[in-house]
């Protein structure tokens, strides 16, 4: 057995508690309607309706459904001038029949005129640098000369400037939304199909905006492969820090798919960055109805301690020591209390791990002997009750502390 020649003693470094909270990257606040992205504000939840924007009633209903579920900013697609003009009616009807909701217009292929029109009616315009000034790829091209590269850059500036000026003068916002799958041809030739190409694509547009004194910018670096997405966002954050830029980042894994894997894939990308302090707003993109995206967003934020909008349940995985049907009881406790906000409730199957593992919980439900459970308030055991009365008595305990509200 190896023996240390010098005993290890406490040092300042060792005795300093390690922080368990996330330190977020400092960003500027960007207003989108009455919602603020960045600037230390809570991470904002977004989604996008899948209705045709020409369907006025359907679009209004879809926006309202999302907003009522907690979607704070809603994006709509605008593929034509007719769609852009329809947004004026959508916004008007939404305000008249429901309330004002921050809206974002999604503009793509050669959308210069569309973007200028839609900027009158929405709070933010999303553009894709790879498609905003879109030129069909040439099959025989082998490279871009420096002059060709710069000439296209000049054309981009000329095309983008009217939109930037319009948004600046209205104090509205722009998202520079780079997609890994749609980088411009000249970026692909110069940087390859890489995170570096994605970052340089965004920086080109950012610099144009800065030169026109417009800084209400949000940046995204989306990709369908999580490792590419992570590398692109991390590089973007690092490059912005090096350049003294403090723009908020919009997180998302594009084309994540559906079901369990789609949720896991989105979480793997989004939560990893949020845990590093990167990210100010997010969208979970699922091949399902948009309404199903919202709970996933809030669950990610809850799990990381960035926003607390529901009950946090702590429950052991069950083992041979468990003194009651843990899965069934957890379901009963959740059903009775999941409308509450901001509580931590622990459901533990035995005394071995129970009190220790649930020490940070507001309330605990612990099996101590067959047929009985012990209820805790924090670390304090309050009472022992028959298992058949456990859920009811837990509710009574929460009520006695004035922390209960009746479900709507």
UniProtKB/Swiss-Prot annotation:
Region (Disordered): 1-25
GO molecular function: 4 iron, 4 sulfur cluster binding; 4-hydroxy-3-methylbut-2-en-1-yl diphosphate synthase activity (ferredoxin); iron ion binding
GO terms, biological process: isopentenyl diphosphate biosynthetic process, methylerythritol 4-phosphate pathway; terpenoid biosynthetic process
Family: Belongs to the IspG family.
Keyword terms of this UniProt record: 4Fe-4S, Iron, Iron-sulfur, Isoprene biosynthesis, Metal-binding, Oxidoreductase
InterPro entries noted in UniProt: Dihydropteroate_synth-like_sf, IspG_bac, IspG_bac-typ, NO2/SO3_Rdtase_4Fe4S_sf
Protein name: 4-hydroxy-3-methylbut-2-en-1-yl diphosphate synthase (ferredoxin)
EC numbers on record: 1.17.7.1
Coiled-coil segments on the chain, per record: none
Residues holding [4Fe-4S] cluster: 316, 319, 350, 357
Coiled coil as UniProt keyword: no
Main function: Converts 2C-methyl-D-erythritol 2,4-cyclodiphosphate (ME-2,4cPP) into 1-hydroxy-2-methyl-2-(E)-butenyl 4-diphosphate.
Lineage: Bacteria, Bacillati, Cyanobacteriota, Cyanophyceae, Acaryochloridales
Required cofactor(s): [4Fe-4S] cluster
Keyword 4Fe-4S assigned: yes
Enzyme class per UniProt: oxidoreductase
A Pfam cross-reference name: GcpE
Catalytic reactions of this protein: (2E)-4-hydroxy-3-methylbut-2-enyl diphosphate + 2 oxidized [2Fe-2S]-[ferredoxin] + H2O = 2-C-methyl-D-erythritol 2,4-cyclic diphosphate + 2 reduced [2Fe-2S]-[ferredoxin] + H(+)
Pathway the protein contributes to: Isoprenoid biosynthesis; isopentenyl diphosphate biosynthesis via DXP pathway; isopentenyl diphosphate from 1-deoxy-D-xylulose 5-phosphate: step 5/6
Name of the coding gene: ispG
Transmembrane segments: none
Binding note for cofactor: Binds 1 [4Fe-4S] cluster.
């Amino acid at each position: 057995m190896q023996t240390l020649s010098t005993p290890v003693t406490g040092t300042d470094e060792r005795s300093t508690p390690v922080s368990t909270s996330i330190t977020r990257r400092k960003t500027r606040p960007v207003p989108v309607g009455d919602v603020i992205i960045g600037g230390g504000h809570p991470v904002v939840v977004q989604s996008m309706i899948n209705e045709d924007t020409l369907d006025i009633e359907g679009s209004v209903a879809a926006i309202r459904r999302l907003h009522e579920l907690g979607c704070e900013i809603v994006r709509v697609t605008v593929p034509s001038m007719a769609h852009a003009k329809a947004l004026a009616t959508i916004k008007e009807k939404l305000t008249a029949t429901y309330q004002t909701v921050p809206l974002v217009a999604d503009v793509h292929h050669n959308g210069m005129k569309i973007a200028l029109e839609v900027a009158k009616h929405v709070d933010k315009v999303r553009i894709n640098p790879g498609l905003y000034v879109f030129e069909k790829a040439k099959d025989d091209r082998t490279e871009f000369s420096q002059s060709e590269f710069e000439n296209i850059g000049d054309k981009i500036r000329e095309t983008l400037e009217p939109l930037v000026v319009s948004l600046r003068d209205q104090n509205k916002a722009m998202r520079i939304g780079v997609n890994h799958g749609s980088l411009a041809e000249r970026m692909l030739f110069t940087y390859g199909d890489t995170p570096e190409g994605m970052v340089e694509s965004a920086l080109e547009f950012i610099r144009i905006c800065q030169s026109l004194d417009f800084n209400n910018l949000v940046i995204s670096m989306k990709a369908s492969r999580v490792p590419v997405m992570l590398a692109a966002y991390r590089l973007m954050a690092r490059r912005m820090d090096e350049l003294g830029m403090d723009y908020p980042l919009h997180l998302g894994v594009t084309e994540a798919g559906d079901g369990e894997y789609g949720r896991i894939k989105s979480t793997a990308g989004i939560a990893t960055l949020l845990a590093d302090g990167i990210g100010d707003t997010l969208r979970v993109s699922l091949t399902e109805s948009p309404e199903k995206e919202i709970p996933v967003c809030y669950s990610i934020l809850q799990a990381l301690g960035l926003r607390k909008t529901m009950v946090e349940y702590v429950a052991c995985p069950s083992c041979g020591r468990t003194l009651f049907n843990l899965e069934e009881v957890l379901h009963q406790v959740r059903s009775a209390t999941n409308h509450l906000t901001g509580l931590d409730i622990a459901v533990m199957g035995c005394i071995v791990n129970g009190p220790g593992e649930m020490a940070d919980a507001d309330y605990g439900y612990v099996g101590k002997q067959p047929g009985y459970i012990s209820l805790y308030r924090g670390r304090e055991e309050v009472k022992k009750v028959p298992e058949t009365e456990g859920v009811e008595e837990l509710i009574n305990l929460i009520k006695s502390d004035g922390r209960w509200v009746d479900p709507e």
